[in-house]
């Protein structure tokens, strides 16, 4: 005799134990089902018939006994092989229909084929054909809530047939239907049986059971009667045989669909779920959007500030060295740089220009207006050393320096604050301290060189005039030195160091720095500031990630039955994992892109408000990548939880 498709031997199923009472639902069920049979399993509520169906459909495992499918011991099959059986061999028709609420009739029917890796065009054509065959051609786009009970059950039957449905497991298929719809469903099952499908009908209604060719009655977990025929049904040869199913199982369980197609399907399904729950999705996205926007804007502001400061510092020249006496210590007095040192340094071949500087903030008055500004005594090399010319009038001359003339060149901010708008500044007088100085020139605008120091708020006077008329001494505060070659700043620094050690009897009582080093130090400071801003903003992205995890955990709880339905139609654990992980990633991707768009809008607004902003592509890409990684990290736990759900418990959850 041919190998039976299904063979149960002394199957037992018990629940509870350890801390709860042990209840044995099935107590030694033995039966065989051959190709082409239409079997009705009938029994009262609580007799164990639904538990038996779950075991037959590989949704549950027995506590004891042997279950062989097409000659293979089901206990030896792994989770992927069991999923293959649910997907390719079995087709489930449930009393409660068990359709995905967010999917259309077409999408519900296509589901088993998606998990089988069937190309989109092929499965869409087959799903449409099945729905048309069952009288639902005009309802393919309708969601379950838009269908009657009978229509939903026909969608469920079409889904069961999608991958062939060689064995239809129908659990009380007419239980929730009116008599007319119930009769239509039974007529469909009769038709399928005549075509060679194995039909296993679970029911408590003996009238419904009488439609089957074979009736098995169970009571209290035991088979009490079985009207098995001696000969197989006449149409048994039309159905698939055990040997063919076994060969297909051996081949198919190790085959996987194209990962690109599977990923695309998961992302499309994720988008549908997000769109259906738009309001909740928007609330969830807020955390990611704010996080990404904060990171991008903070880094852009930091980068803009850095570039602005670097440009302003570089505007003074990168070949400048600064020399001043070392500060006093407990053992040594403060170092002192004299004008003789200045003259000696000026003789070095590496030095292009040298300038002693005397300066401090002083009260400046003009008419009734008085304010404090930095007043510096410099020589005529000031414009060349600092690349800072006079744009109106002229800079003071060597003659002015030699005669200690009371003339001044003022910055743009001094002009703005002290002189009347529209007036000619050249020739006007400013009272610096108690000494009147005539304005002979206006410096070009420079802005802030670093921090909050505004270079345009300064007044430049001849060094000799500052020493005699304002400060009463000729010892410079520091020396500004322009190297002849900007590529030889280090060599120039070394030459000055050697010269001063010789002049100061070997003492290193001076400090020598260069603008290039200052610019590098400022760059490091600005980078640290940018990193700090980015780290602060990243915290909001982390909070957004936690929000994604929370919503995904809630989604898993809400969609537990959907997960069970997907497993019943052949989804493997990795399919469920990919599905929910795709939703988390989709959330993060949409949130990331929206956050970047928001950041660009905010950046444009800041630019209009004269705040320096510089968007960097690596920062934008990095923020987006972090958002996606956040989705993966925080979405993995909920997705893993969903993938590990028990199919039976998931199906029966509320």
Swiss-Prot record:
Disruption phenotype: Deletion of pvdRT-opmQ leads to reduced amounts of PVD in the medium and decreased growth under iron limitation. Deletion of both PvdRT-OpmQ and MdtABC-OpmB systems strongly affects growth under iron limitation as well as PVD secretion. The keyword Plastid does not apply. Pfam families: ABC_tran, FtsX, MacB_PCD. Keywords: Antibiotic resistance, ATP-binding, Cell inner membrane, Cell membrane, Membrane, Nucleotide-binding, Translocase, Transmembrane, Transmembrane helix, Transport. It is a multi-pass membrane protein. ATP binds at residues 43-50. One of its GO terms (biological process) is response to antibiotic. Induction: Expression is stimulated by iron limitation. Residues 6-245 form the ABC transporter domain. The keyword Manganese does not apply. The chain crosses the membrane at residues 282-302, 529-549, 584-604, 614-634. One of its GO terms (cellular component) is plasma membrane. It is found in: Cell inner membrane. Has a basal ATPase activity that is stimulated by PvdR. In vitro, interaction with PVD influences the affinity of PvdT to PvdR. Belongs to the ABC transporter superfamily. Macrolide exporter (TC 3.A.1.122) family. Part of the tripartite efflux system PvdRT-OpmQ required for the secretion into the extracellular milieu of the siderophore pyoverdine (PVD), which is involved in iron acquisition. This subunit binds PVD and drives its secretion by hydrolyzing ATP. The system is responsible for export of newly synthesized PVD after the final steps of biosynthesis have taken place in the periplasm. Part of the tripartite efflux system PvdRT-OpmQ, which is composed of an inner membrane component with both ATPase and permease domains, PvdT, a periplasmic membrane fusion protein, PvdR, and an outer membrane component, OpmQ. This is Pyoverdine export ATP-binding/permease protein PvdT. It comes from Pseudomonas putida (strain ATCC 47054 / DSM 6125 / CFBP 8728 / NCIMB 11950 / KT2440). The gene is pvdT.
């Amino acid at each position: 005799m041919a190998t039976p498709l299904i063979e149960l031997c002394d199957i037992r199923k018990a629940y509870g134990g350890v801390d709860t009472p042990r209840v044995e639902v099935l107590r030694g069920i033995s039966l065989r089902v051959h190709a082409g049979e239409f079997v009705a399993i009938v029994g009262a509520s609580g007799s164990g018939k639904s538990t038996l169906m779950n075991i037959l459909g590989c949704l549950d495992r027995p506590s004891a006994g042997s279950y062989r499918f097409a000659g293979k011991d089901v206990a030896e099959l792994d989770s992927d092989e069991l999923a293959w059986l649910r997907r390719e061999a079995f087709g489930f028709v449930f009393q409660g229909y068990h359709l995905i609420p967010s999917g259309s009739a077409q999408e519900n029917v296509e589901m088993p084929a998606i998990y089988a890796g069937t190309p989109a065009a092929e499965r869409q054509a087959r799903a449409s054909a099945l729905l048309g065959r069952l009288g639902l051609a005009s309802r393919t786009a309708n969601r379950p809530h838009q269908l009657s009970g009978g229509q939903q059950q026909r969608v469920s039957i079409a889904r069961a047939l999608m991958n062939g449905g060689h064995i239809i497991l129908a659990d009380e298929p007419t239980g929730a239907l009116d008599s007319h719809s119930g009769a239509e469903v039974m007529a469909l099952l009769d038709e399928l049986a005549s075509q060679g499908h194995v039909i296993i009908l679970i029911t408590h209604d003996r009238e419904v059971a009488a439609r089957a060719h074979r009736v098995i009655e169970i009571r209290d977990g035991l088979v009490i009667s079985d009207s098995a025929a001696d000969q197989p049904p006449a149409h048994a040869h039309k159905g698939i045989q055990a040997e063919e199913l076994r060969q297909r199982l051996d081949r198919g369980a190790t085959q996987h669909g194209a990962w690109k197609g599977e990923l695309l399907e998961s992302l499309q399904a994720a988008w549908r779920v997000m769109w259906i729950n738009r309001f909740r999705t928007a609330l969830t996205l807020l955390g990611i959007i704010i996080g990404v926007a904060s990171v991008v804007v903070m880094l852009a502001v930091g980068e803009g500030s850095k570039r602005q400061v670097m440009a302003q510092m570089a505007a003074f020249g990168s070949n400048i060295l600064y020399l001043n006496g070392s500060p006093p210590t407990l053992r040594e007095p403060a170092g002192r740089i004299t004008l003789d040192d200045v003259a000696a340094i000026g003789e070095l071949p590496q030095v292009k220009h040298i300038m002693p500087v005397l300066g401090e903030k002083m009260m400046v008055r003009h008419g009734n207006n008085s304010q404090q500004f930095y007043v510096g005594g410099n020589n005529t090399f000031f414009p060349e050393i600092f690349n800072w010319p006079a744009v109106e009038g002229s800079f003071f001359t060597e003659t002015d320096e030699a005669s200690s003339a009371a003339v001044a060149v003022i910055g743009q901010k001094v002009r703005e604050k002290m002189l009347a708008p529209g007036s000619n500044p050249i020739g006007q007088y400013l009272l610096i301290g108690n000494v009147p100085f005539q304005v002979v020139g206006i410096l070009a605008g420079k802005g802030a060189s670093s921090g909050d120091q505004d270079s345009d708020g300064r007044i430049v006077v001849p060094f000799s005039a500052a020493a005699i008329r304002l400060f009463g001494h000729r010892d410079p505060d520091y020396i500004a030195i322009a190297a002849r070659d900007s590529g030889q700043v280090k060599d120039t620094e070394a030459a000055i160091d050697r010269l001063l050690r010789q002049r100061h009897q070997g003492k290193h009582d001076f400090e020598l720095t260069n603008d290039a080093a200052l610019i590098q130090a400022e760059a490091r400071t600005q980078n640290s500031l940018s990193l700090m801003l980015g780290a602060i903003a990243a915290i909001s992205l982390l909070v957004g990630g936690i929000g994604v995890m929370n919503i995904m955990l809630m989604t898993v709880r809400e969609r537990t039955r959907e997960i069970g339905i997907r497993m019943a139609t052949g989804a493997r654990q990795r399919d469920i994992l990919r599905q929910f992980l795709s939703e988390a990633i989709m959330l993060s991707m949409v949130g990331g892109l929206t956050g970047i768009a928001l950041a660009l809008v905010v950046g444009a607004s800041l630019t209009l408000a004269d705040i320096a902003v510089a968007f960097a592509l690596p920062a934008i890409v990095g923020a987006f990548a972090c958002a996606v990684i956040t989705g993966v990290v925080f979405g993995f736990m909920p997705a893993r939880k969903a993938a590990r759900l028990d199919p039976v418990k998931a199906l029966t959850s509320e």
